[in-house]
Amino acid sequence: MTIAETLLPEFDLEMTTTRRVLERVPTDKGKWKPHPKSFSMGHLAQLVAGMPGWITNAVQETYLDLARYPGYSYEKTEDLLESFDRNVAGARKALAASKDSDYAVQWSLKHGERVIFSQPRGAVVRQTINHLVHHRGQLTVYLRLVDVPVPSIYGPTADEPMPGF
């Protein structure tokens, strides 16, 4: 079994769940924040929608430069979903095409010339999935605070039973 074959089932499950969360994001709450120091809901949703693209970058490139990363805007939910679907398809394709040796290649997160960290691609892919799941969890709290039903994720929520049960 290849590394990609071990990653893809988890990736598929997490992306399916993430899409269900993004579907619930109300477009009219883009500027809403639970606290002045928090991201706005629109910023957080756009971050979550874009993060699968970071996996594509990690598998196909050797660095990501945050200084070149576009800023955040407030997108309609439909646009976020289109972006998310495009990023998921690209990441899945990159993962499926990868060789085990690709995961040992060093990858760096940079801001201009400053290197924030460098790690093997395999660690970066896993950390990116974990990072996305973390922000997805934040987004579910935002949804709850604006009275939007929270979908089932790893089990039932107060709003939705677990699918298939």
List each model region and its residues.
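Short, contiguous alpha-helical
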Residues: 8-23, 27-70, 110-165
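Short coil/turn linker and secondary-structure boundary residues
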Residues: 2, 39, 72-75, 98, ...
